[in-house]
Each structure stands twice: as C-alpha cells, then as structure tokens.
Amino acid sequence: MSTSIPDVAVHDSPAVAAPLRWVGMDGIVVPVQLTTADGGQHVIGRARAQIDLPAMEVKGIHMSRLYRLLDTHAVEPLTPVGICGLLSAMVNSHADCASTAARVDWHFDWLRRVPALVSNDLSGWRGYPVSLRAEYSAVHVQFWLCVEVGYSSTCPCSAALARQMLADAFLQEHVEVSALSPETVADWLRSNGSYATPHSQRSVARIEVALTEQAVELGLPALVDCAERILSTPVQAAVRRVDEQAFARLNGANLMYVEDATRRLQHGLAIHYSAFRVHVRHLESLHPHDAVASTVDE
C-alpha cells in the first residue's frame, strides 16, 4: 500500500491552460477584532480570501495555506497596517503559482450603543453592516471601508401636498369666521393636524471611503458620526414619547429626496475624506419600488 498522499493541484496539469484573475474562498467564518476610540469589540464576520493564478500550467492553488494565514491573522485587531502583512504573506505562500496579487474582504456588523435623542437615562444598541476590502499587488495596496447607515427620509413633495390639504381644510371650515384666537387655532390643529400626512420611509446610505495602508484603526465611529450628522435623521434605538416627538421634528426639518440626501453626503464627506463612494436607497412607502442615487469622488 502506498504511503504517499496524492496532491492533484501539484502533480496534475489543467485540461485548459489559462491564467486566472482571482482564485480562493468566500464565506469563511472568522472572528473580527475591532479597536476604536470607543473601546475594543469582538464580532463574528465572514471573509473572502483570494490570490491571482498567472501560472497557466498550475492546476490549482493551495487554499488551505490561505485559510491558515487568515486564521492566524484573526487574533490581531483588524487594521490596514496589519492587513498589509497578511496580503504579502498570501502572495509569498504561492510563489510556486507565480502569484503577485491578493485580496481579502471582511463583512460584519459593528455594534454601537447610542443614546436617545432627549431622554438622558435611555440608550440602546444599533448595528451597522460593515465591509472592508483590501487588495495588494506589485503596484499598489488599496483599502476601502464601507458602512451602511440607516435613516428616515420624508418626501418634500408629499409634505407640500399635505400642508396644502391642511390649509384648505382649515379655510373651508372657517370660511365665515373673520377672527380666531391663537388658542382656537391651536385646538383645531391638535384635532385636525393629521388631516393629511406626508409619506416617509426608512432609508439606507451605503458609504465607502478609502483608507491609507498606514492607518492603525478603521475609523468606524468617525465615519458613522459624520454620516449621521450630515443626514440628521438617523434611525433610533430605545425611545420614549419625548424622543419620538424629537425625531418627528428632525424629520420635518430635514425633508429630502434621494437626490438631496446624496448631495448632502457628497458635500459633507468631501471635507473629511479624499476618496469616497456613496449609494443611497429610499425604500419608498408610496411606491412598490425604491428610489436610488449614487455619487463617486475618487
């Protein structure tokens, strides 16, 4: 009985000789260590790890090598500085495949405790979907951090239509009244202010920013704070009625189409980030489809 274990990837030849741009694994379950000014955090994520395969005569790469490298790196905080070493090691591990490029993507949810808008003693958890893409080659190293920020958007057109209907209803009911006290008007508004309401919806801004390879942290709190400050109506966690009332006021003060939200982000992000991509989606409550807009500044 033979004691040698066959290695088809090494000893067999491909049926069709051709270079491959990327080869590797996707959906790898990995622990992710995050370090921020808010403190450290351990979350569960999924990763994709790939290298190029320029050697046409090589049947396949050694995926177990990539897995072990990714597993070893998982004990370190996720930072561009540390990832550079991982990418370089991935390429070096496949010198027998003539590999010159590597890339890894991570996907996970970043958890953050956020305070209520008004209630000082109330807070709750928010989860932000995050992805980090790192790509290494002989000519460049690129890092893109992406986060999804949820917020509320109220349609400006719908708000104008609702105001008109409310005004018309008020005039129709008081057409023969020459003078009204402020208290009477206030009572009427309390009873009839919802005669027509504008449509609003949960919305999502997907924001990607470029990171430098020297960065020692991802900068998630700063990016999320920047986006939520620009949009002004981030979705909330724990609320009381006073917080919900404050949220309604913010929505009324920040009416926006999908175009408005995208332009706001474009203007505000340009102050802090040299390269970014924005994709905005409003999950319309009026329509069965979404409104979308995007912009790029690279």
Curated annotation (Swiss-Prot):
Biological process terms from the Gene Ontology for this record are: tetrahydrofolate biosynthetic process
Site residues, May be catalytically important = 155
Give this protein's Gene Ontology molecular function annotations: GTP cyclohydrolase I activity
Q: In which pathway does it act?
A: Cofactor biosynthesis; 7,8-dihydroneopterin triphosphate biosynthesis; 7,8-dihydroneopterin triphosphate from GTP: step 1/1
What PANTHER family does this protein's entry cite? GTP CYCLOHYDROLASE MPTA
Alphabetically ordered keywords of this record: Hydrolase
Family from the record: Belongs to the GTP cyclohydrolase IV family.
Per the record, the domain of life is: Bacteria
EC number(s)? 3.5.4.16
UniProt xrefs under InterPro entries: GTP_cyclohydrolase_FolE2, GTP_cyclohydrolase_FolE2/MptA
What name does the UniProt record give this protein?
GTP cyclohydrolase FolE2
Main function: Converts GTP to 7,8-dihydroneopterin triphosphate.
Organism lineage = Bacteria, Pseudomonadati, Pseudomonadota, Gammaproteobacteria, Lysobacterales
Keyword Hydrolase appears in the UniProt entry: yes
Q: Which reaction does it catalyse?
A: GTP + H2O = 7,8-dihydroneopterin 3'-triphosphate + formate + H(+)
